[in-house]
């Protein structure tokens, strides 16, 4: 039995300069480590990210409490455990925490251990992490699917210090035949967008996720700039590239009026009006995927949007579902959305993440594995995307080392898989 010999938690730094938790799990022959990200626009149903709240240190964002739980009760409970028993180990940590949202130890503490355990187990088995995750997920053994990337290119909302309300404007390189080709396309388009912005005298400052964060007079202007950068790169919108947006609509929703406040355009929309506003953008700019197009507090609005757009556009629930099987089941029962964004730290363990992916797939929902705005160099989500054949991944632009690390890992995985890997093909009625 490959026993866990030691567990060491430590405080490290994420891409925003804030502390986060890293855990190293030791077994005979070596160790493996994992670090966890954090979000800026955080859904109310997410598992708790434990912070120190000591304003004298890192403005209250330290994670020494979470680290102390890794090095204390979690360490004590897991030493001597079989490192390959992922579900048992995750269950022990969840039960020790004893809360519904992991508020005692913190999802950041539990997830860092959970991912490090998976990495150590894959090392013991002498298989790549994606293969070990595939085994845990009980995926079909014949082929694995390489994910199609959704590549953030312009940032707004809470991810940027600008006037755009929509949080992310993304490109999807549907014309690519491999992940390597998709990355090339994304890199070239991003480069040309910078040139276009610069030539127009528009700021090329970056947002939290590495996309450009210019001040613009409308969302349509942002989409026009992206369209221009696609064409300047020699690609064709709708044929080679389609677009996606993340509205992060919970941040725009005024619960007192039940309206969406689009400050950049000085407009207020009802749920229905916001749906048709997004639909008009989708038709004009080949937007095939809309994430959080309604607030997590507006389930009726989300149901209406799904009824109107769900048969032709990928409608993703992020804050709505928070990678939580109970919330996802509610959405399935009410026919709300048709896809789910998967963020490991929203739920706080690998086992629960895999359970949510499986439930979504069984219900016919699309699955998109996602990074967070405060990222680390950890590449686990690349392996999770492949190991579960999720189909899509959202991990930022081809820029900034914490984002590029995931793309480079996907390049390596594609090379290792060879003909056993199939690149995901996006199918959408808007594209036909």
UniProtKB/Swiss-Prot annotation:
Chain positions recorded as Mg(2+) binding sites: 246, 291, 318
Keyword annotations of the record: Cytoplasm, Glycolysis, Lyase, Magnesium, Metal-binding, Secreted
Annotated pathway: Carbohydrate degradation; glycolysis; pyruvate from D-glyceraldehyde 3-phosphate: step 4/5
Catalytic center residues: 209, 343
A biological process from GO: glycolytic process
Annotated GO MF terms: magnesium ion binding; phosphopyruvate hydratase activity
GO cellular component: a single term: cell surface
Highest taxon of source: Bacteria
InterPro entries, per database record: Enolase, Enolase-like_C_sf, Enolase-like_N, Enolase_C, Enolase_CS, Enolase_N
Annotated positions binding (2R)-2-phosphoglycerate: 167, 343, 372-373, 394
E.C. designation(s): 4.2.1.11
Function statement: Catalyzes the reversible conversion of 2-phosphoglycerate (2-PG) into phosphoenolpyruvate (PEP). It is essential for the degradation of carbohydrates via glycolysis.
Protein name, per record: Enolase
Lineage: Bacteria, Pseudomonadati, Pseudomonadota, Gammaproteobacteria, Enterobacterales
């Amino acid at each position: 039995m490959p026993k866990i010999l030691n567990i060491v938690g430590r405080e490290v730094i994420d891409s925003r300069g804030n502390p986060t938790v890293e855990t190293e799990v030791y077994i005979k022959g070596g160790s493996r480590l994992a670090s966890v990200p954090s979000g800026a626009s955080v859904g109310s149903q997410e598992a708790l990210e434990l912070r120190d709240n000591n304003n004298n240190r890192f403005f209250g964002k330290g994670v020494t409490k979470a680290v102390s739980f890794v090095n204390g009760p979690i360490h004590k409970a897991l030493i001597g455990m079989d490192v390959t028993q992922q579900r048992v180990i995750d269950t022990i940590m969840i039960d020790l925490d004893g809360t519904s949202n992991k508020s005692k130890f913190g999802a950041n503490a539990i997830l860092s251990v959970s991912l490090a355990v998976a990495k150590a187990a894959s090392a013991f088995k002498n298989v790549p992490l994606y293969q070990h995750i595939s085994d845990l997920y009980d995926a079909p053994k014949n082929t694995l699917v390489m994910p199609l990337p959704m590549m953030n290119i312009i940032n707004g909302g809470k991810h940027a210090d600008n006037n755009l309300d929509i949080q992310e404007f993304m490109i999807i390189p549907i014309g690519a035949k491999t992940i390597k080709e998709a990355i090339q396309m994304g890199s070239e388009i991003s480069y040309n967008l910078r040139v276009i912005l610069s030539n127009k005298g528009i700021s090329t400052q970056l947002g939290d996720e590495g996309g450009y964060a210019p001040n613009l007079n409308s969302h349509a202007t942002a989409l026009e700039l992206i369209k221009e950068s696609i064409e300047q790169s020699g690609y064709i919108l709708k044929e080679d590239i389609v677009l996606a947006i993340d509205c992060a609509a919970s941040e725009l929703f005024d619960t007192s009026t039940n309206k969406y406040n689009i400050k950049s355009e000085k407009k207020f929309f009802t749920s229905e009006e916001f749906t048709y506003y997004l639909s008009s953008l989708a038709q004009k700019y080949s937007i095939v995927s809309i994430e959080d197009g309604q607030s997590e507090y507006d389930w009726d609005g989300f149901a209406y949007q799904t009824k109107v757009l769900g048969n032709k556009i990928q409608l993703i629930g992020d804050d709505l579902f928070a990678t939580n099987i109970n919330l996802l089941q509610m959405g399935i029962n009410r026919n709300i959305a048709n896809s789910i964004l998967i963020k490991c730290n929203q739920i706080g363990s690998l086992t629960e993440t895999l359970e949510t992916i499986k439930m979504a797939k069984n219900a016919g929902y699309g699955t998109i594995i996602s990074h967070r705005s405060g990222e680390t160099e950890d590449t686990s989500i690349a392996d999770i995307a492949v190991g579960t054949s999720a189909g899509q991944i959202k991990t930022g632009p081809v820029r900034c080392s914490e984002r590029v690390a995931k793309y480079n890992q996907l390049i390596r995985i594609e090379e290792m898989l060879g003909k056993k890997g199939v690149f995901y093909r996006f199918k959408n009625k808007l594209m036909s």
